[in-house]
């Protein structure tokens, strides 16, 4: 039965840099009640605020632990913890019958991701993965162009997803235990998701990756800060993804993403985060972004599915929006193969 009353959404953790943005988006949505908890925030060595302080700064109701968060009876939860802590929160949500939107990557290990998918399926709860670039109008146009056959058969894709190293605001991104790696884990998955959507979930066949720590070497981080990943898919399609933390710290924007698809009849390139007006000020470059709020579109898609699915029923499939947990597993398989390839210096077969 669908949900007609205001929907109750929990936010589990402020560890991820996207958490505050999701919260602000939700606060502006009608028919949504919010509650957040960030129990690990007080002990995190971050310069930016977390926990009750961050919640208060954006006007977000807050409780101190996940027991109180789930006792509130949420219909849905957005999991924005450190990557290695996703599984525990998602499995608890499944046990409580709470629909889940999980930040990317789904987990740090494929076995954990598969367990999360299985737990949500058994409990009848939604498991959606936070890949907002799928909702960019530029990607929609590219997908429609490809589906219409205008590019012919795609045989090569070049993706870039570069950004600033997030060490100042959230140090765990450079901790291999909590993040699962560095730049490859952080940035390969967005382009991998777009390719997954364009190919209808085609599996990767081989992955060859190279990574190093030349960028930001002065920061003494334990994870890779630069990487290049080459993927061969079942059809023979070849894709490369530059996933480096190569955006300068002083840049006026966090970074960006590009995707160029080449087929037998032509090629199209998109740059979803390019729209802005800019200039110069006394402190340097000025950049004012505009355009579609893809985070809002992602959350809209999730909440629409939650409303239409209603309360979870064990063993009964809900309305699952895309990208779902299966997409999360497939994209993590690519990241995992890239990590292994970079370690051994050779291609890895999936």
Q: Predicted regions span which residues?
A:
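Beta-loop-alpha module in the N-terminal Rossmann-like domain of NAD(P)-dependent dehydrogenases
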Residues: 47, 57-119
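Rossmann-fold dehydrogenase core element
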Residues: 115-133, 152-157
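Predominantly a Rossmann-like dinucleotide-binding segment in NAD(P)-dependent oxidoreductases
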Residues: 133-220, 345
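C-terminal helix-rich "cap/oligomerization" subdomain common to oxidoreductases
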Residues: 1-3, 68, 76-78, 234, ...
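N-terminal Rossmann-like dinucleotide-binding module
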Residues: 1-57
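C-terminal glycine/acidic-rich active-site capping loop/insertion
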Residues: 10, 29, 52, 60, ...
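Hydrophobic residues in well-ordered beta-strands that form the structural core
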Residues: 64, 102, 127-129, 270
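Contiguous beta-strand/loop segments that form the cofactor/metal-binding neighborhood of enzyme cores
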Residues: 5, 193-274, 299-311
């Amino acid at each position: 039965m669908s949900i007609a009353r205001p929907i109750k959404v929990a936010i589990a953790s402020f560890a991820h840099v996207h958490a505050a943005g999701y919260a602000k988006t939700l606060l502006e949505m009608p028919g949504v009640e919010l509650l957040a908890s960030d129990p690990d925030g007080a002990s995190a060595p971050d310069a930016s605020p977390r926990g009750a302080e961050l919640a208060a700064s954006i006007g977000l109701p807050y409780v101190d632990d996940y027991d109180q968060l789930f006792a509130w009876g949420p219909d849905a939860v957005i999991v924005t913890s450190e990557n290695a802590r996703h599984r525990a929160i998602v499995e608890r949500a499944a046990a409580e019958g709470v629909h889940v939107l999980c930040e990317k990557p789904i987990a740090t290990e494929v076995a954990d991701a598969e367990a999360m998918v299985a737990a949500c399926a058994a409990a009848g709860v939604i498991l959606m993965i936070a890949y907002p670039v799928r909702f960019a109008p530029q990607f929609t146009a590219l997908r429609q162009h490809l589906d219409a056959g205008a590019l012919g058969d795609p045989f090569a894709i070049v993706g870039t997803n570069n950004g600033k190293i997030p060490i100042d605001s959230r140090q765990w991104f450079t901790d291999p235990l909590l993040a699962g790696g560095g730049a490859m884990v952080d940035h390969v998955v967005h382009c991998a998701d777009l390719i997954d959507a364009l190919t209808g979930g085609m599996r990767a066949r081989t992955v060859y990756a190279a990574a190093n720590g030349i960028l930001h070497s002065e920061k003494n981080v334990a994870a890779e800060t630069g990487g290049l990943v080459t993927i061969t898919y079942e059809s023979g399609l070849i894709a490369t993804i530059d996933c480096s933390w190569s955006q300068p710290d002083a840049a006026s924007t966090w970074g960006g993403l590009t995707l160029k698809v080449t087929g037998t009849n032509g090629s199209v390139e998109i740059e979803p985060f390019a729209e802005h007006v800019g200039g110069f000020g006394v402190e340097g470059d000025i950049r004012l972004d505009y355009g579609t709020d893809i985070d809002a579109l992602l959350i809209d898609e999730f909440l629409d599915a939650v409303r239409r699915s209603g309360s979870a029923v064990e063993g009964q499939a809900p309305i699952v929006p895309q990208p779902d947990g299966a997409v999360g597993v497939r994209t993590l398989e690519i990241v995992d193969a890239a990590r292994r390839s970079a370690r051994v210096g050779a291609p890895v077969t999936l």
